[in-house]
């Protein structure tokens, strides 16, 4: 096949396009791919696909299937991480003859911002529905627990043998334990008194608490935006939300060497928070270099009783999201092996 024709066509395509050999080495990148990956074509073609992409939400080996089947394949929801940047893409892979060899034509289209927003809103609605269900069940459990505890206390007074009170004590203790769990499931339903607070002071408290609790050496780095203004908030609740996230990261990193957490703040203009445009917002990024969150848990990570950590209760992140929601903010998460970032947005009202 004459390579000049596809080169002329591909160079003018608005779709980011790569040509790969059967070992997934990159043999060609068009100008649109240079823009997508923020690298020159010369640099791109010096790499294999696995070198260019730090992490992918699909098995890259599956991309060779068209070589055997002769048919194109398309995945409309793919995430590639390149130079630490997640790219949400629709990817189509087709067999092509290039320089007299059978190769792979990979076309990548960025997922439309509106579609991403729709996915985000749908996921948030599902999370809220799950939390409402759990809260409803928690309320149903809480009422009979009070009756059970009260009955045990009355029974204790009527027992003829004082030694039998050991059993009523067990009933009361377990009822209190269940009630405490239910209270955590319910969480605070609305924020307390809001005042103008310095977010960096709250984050410093969180950092100090986590460093004191960490049994092994974990480095916590800070990268604060000095221009970040004060924010109207319930300081205790925001501290709790941040503490849950940073503590989770520290507990996961306690099982590895050279654990590092980075807390970064930025002022963001025209932030999109659950479909609503916010003129000014604070963005807090909490990043760790731990093993990452398994892909199958990422969509349900903020649901009550879901935990990516052995021995975790599955309540910390759910509570954090609830507290941030009550401040009209949002939490996002991006994770792959060696990298997890929780991003919190809080509106700045003026």
From Swiss-Prot:
Would I find Hydrolase among this entry's keywords? yes
Bilayer-crossing regions: none
Q: Name one GO biological process term.
A: regulation of DNA-templated transcription
SMART domains given in the database record: HATPase_c (SM00387), HisKA (SM00388), PAS (SM00091)
- Where on this chain does ATP bind? 330
Compartments, record wording: Cytoplasm
What the entry says about post-translational processing? Answer: Autophosphorylated.
Q: What is its main location?
A: cytoplasm
| UniProt domain Histidine kinase: residue ranges | 136-350
Q: Name one GO molecular function term.
A: hydrolase activity
This enzyme catalyses: ATP + protein L-histidine = ADP + protein N-phospho-L-histidine
Pfam family, any one: HATPase_c
Q: Which domain of life is it from?
A: Bacteria
Give the PAS domain ranges.
4-67
The function of this protein is: Member of the two-component regulatory system NtrB/NtrC, which controls expression of the nitrogen-regulated (ntr) genes in response to nitrogen limitation. Under conditions of nitrogen limitation, NtrB autophosphorylates and transfers the phosphoryl group to NtrC. In the presence of nitrogen, acts as a phosphatase that dephosphorylates and inactivates NtrC.
Spell out the protein name for this chain: Sensory histidine kinase/phosphatase NtrB
Question: What organism is the protein native to?
Answer: Vibrio alginolyticus
Organismal lineage: Bacteria, Pseudomonadati, Pseudomonadota, Gammaproteobacteria, Vibrionales
């Amino acid at each position: 096949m004459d390579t000049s024709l596809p080169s002329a066509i591909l160079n003018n395509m608005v779709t980011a396009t790569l040509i790969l050999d059967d070992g997934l080495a990159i043999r060609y990148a068009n100008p649109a791919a240079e823009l997508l990956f923020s690298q020159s074509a010369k640099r791109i073609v010096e790499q294999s696909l696995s070198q260019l992409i730090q992490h992918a939400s699909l098995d890259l080996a599956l991309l060779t299937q068209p070589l055997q089947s002769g048919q194109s394949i398309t995945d409309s929801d793919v995430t590639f991480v390149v130079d630490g940047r997640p790219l949400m893409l629709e990817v189509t892979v087709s067999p092509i003859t290039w320089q007299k060899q059978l190769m792979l034509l990979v076309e990548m289209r960025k997922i439309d911002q509106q579609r991403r927003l729709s996915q985000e809103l749908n996921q948030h609605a599902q999370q809220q529905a799950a939390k409402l269900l759990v809260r409803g069940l928690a309320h149903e459990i809480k009422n009979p627990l009070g009756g059970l505890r009260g009955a045990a206390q009355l029974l204790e007074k009527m027992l003829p043998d004082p030694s039998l009170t050991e059993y009523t004590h067990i009933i009361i203790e377990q009822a209190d334990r269940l009630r405490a769990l239910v209270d955590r499931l319910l969480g605070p339903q609305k924020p307390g008194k809001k005042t103008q607070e310095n977010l960096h002071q709250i984050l410093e408290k969180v950092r100090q608490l986590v460093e004191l609790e960490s049994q092994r050496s974990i480095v916590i780095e800070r990268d604060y935006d000095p221009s970040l203004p004060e924010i109207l908030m319930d300081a205790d609740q925001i501290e709790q939300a941040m503490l849950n996230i940073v503590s989770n990261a520290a507990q996961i990193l306690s099982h590895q060497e050279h654990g590092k957490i980075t807390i970064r703040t930025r002022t963001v203009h025209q932030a999109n928070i659950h479909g609503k445009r916010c003129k000014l917002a604070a963005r807090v990024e909490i990043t760790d270099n731990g093993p990452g969150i398994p892909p199958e848990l990422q969509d349900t990570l903020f649901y009550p009783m879901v935990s990516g950590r052995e021995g975790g209760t599955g309540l910390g992140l759910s509570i954090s999201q609830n507290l941030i929601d009550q401040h009209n903010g949002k939490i996002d998460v991006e994770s792959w092996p060696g990298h997890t970032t929780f991003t919190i947005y809080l509106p700045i009202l003026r």
